[in-house]
């Protein structure tokens, strides 16, 4: 079967158009890669997040960082804090929080996925995430983010207040080497676009009564306001490393002036005698200097006698402090000084000469 010159010309033109069209399509596709997956906010329904657009919020237009809770019991406080961060241009928001379920043992995790929220999707800054991974400062680990509420509870407020921003989500396992935290904070300081905001998603005292929670919170707030890095690891908070990362970043930015409020679950729920209190700090940081000094605290006991029945209990492995240390051992955390009146001598000699 033969083809005329006209037919061959038409076929050739069609082939060229097809190739050009395919090339254009390919170029467009490769320029804007679609994230390979999606995570989801803690709840799909908007009402779980309280009043996301509260009135009377004082704007912190120069703020470069913040601390919020991830406990939706205080949803309105989260909303007020994040709304106060609104600025004309916020290219990237970084959220850093604890890996509650230790899904990345001893590690720093980042996500390349977007998050679906009641107000739409928030996409990741994949270039920045890839750069963090390439610098060996973190690993991409989507498994961590499947159920990590320190991130999933906060992203809806980011999407609502900053609809055009990109997200970098980071989780930290407990007790990461300080050098790794400082290296990541330094990287963020150097690579984040101007106008970006870093948010630490952290809760404070856990499983204590109101008096003990207030005691620990006073120490925590004072240490954070003073950028007292030496005290961070002993604070009664669920992610000291997240706070260390935030404060290190803010120190490099010169944004150390804090505006802060505190509350706790006993106040919110009107249960003043609760013995299972969770407390919260809501803070923003703007250009300026830190508080001049941190706080010191001390714990005082009465008489202590370590002989007789007490000695027997100790030798049998009985935990003498089981009922005061709390479920997570938090009551005795972070003390600068412990004072007690010791009755009787302490000696390694078991018999008199």
Enumerate the language-model features and the residues they cover.
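A generic secondary-structure signal marking the coil-to-beta-strand transition
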Residues: 59-66, 92, 279, 294-297, ...
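Long, Lys/Arg- and hydrophobic-enriched amphipathic alpha-helices
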Residues: 264-291
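N-terminal Sec-pathway targeting helices
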Residues: 1-18, 25
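Juxtamembrane cytosolic interface motif at the C-terminal end of transmembrane helices
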Residues: 22-30
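Active-site histidine-anchored catalytic micro-motif
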Residues: 29-271
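Acidic, metal/ion-coordinating pockets
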Residues: 290-353
């Amino acid at each position: 079967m033969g083809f005329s010159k006209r037919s061959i010309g038409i076929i050739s033109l069609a082939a060229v158009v097809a190739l050009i069209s395919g090339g254009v399509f390919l170029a467009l596709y490769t320029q804007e890669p679609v994230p390979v997956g999606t995570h989801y906010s803690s709840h799909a329904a908007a009402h779980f997040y309280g009043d996301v657009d509260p009135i009377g919020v004082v704007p912190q237009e120069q703020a470069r960082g913040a601390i919020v809770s991830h406990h939706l019991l205080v949803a309105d406080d989260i909303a007020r804090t994040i709304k106060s961060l609104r600025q004309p241009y916020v290219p990237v928001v970084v959220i850093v929080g604890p890996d509650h379920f230790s899904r990345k043992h001893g590690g720093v995790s980042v996500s390349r996925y977007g998050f679906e929220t009641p107000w739409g999707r928030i996409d990741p800054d994949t270039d920045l995430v890839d750069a963090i991974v390439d610098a060996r400062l973190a690993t991409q680990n989507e498994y961590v983010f499947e159920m990590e509420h320190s991130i999933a509870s906060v992203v809806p407020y980011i999407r609502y207040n900053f609809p055009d921003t990109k997200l970098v989500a980071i989780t930290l396992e407990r007790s990461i080497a300080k050098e790794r935290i400082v290296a990541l904070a330094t990287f963020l300081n150097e690579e984040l676009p101007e106008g970006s905001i870093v948010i630490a998603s952290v809760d404070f005292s856990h499983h204590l009564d109101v008096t003990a929670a207030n005691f620990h919170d006073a120490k925590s707030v004072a240490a954070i306001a003073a950028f007292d890095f030496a005290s961070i690891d002993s604070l009664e908070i669920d992610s000291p490393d997240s706070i260390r990362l935030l404060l290190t970043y803010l120190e490099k930015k010169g944004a150390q002036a804090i505006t802060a409020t505190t509350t706790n679950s006993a106040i919110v729920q009107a249960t003043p005698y609760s013995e299972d209190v969770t407390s919260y700090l809501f803070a923003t940081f703007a250009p300026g200097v830190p508080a001049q000094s941190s706080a010191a605290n001390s714990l005082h006991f009465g008489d202590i006698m370590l002989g007789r029945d007490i000695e027997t209990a100790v030798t049998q492995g009985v935990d003498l402090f089981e009922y005061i240390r709390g479920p997570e051992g938090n009551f005795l955390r972070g003390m600068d000084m412990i004072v007690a009146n010791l009755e009787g001598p302490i000696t390694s000699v078991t018999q008199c000469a």
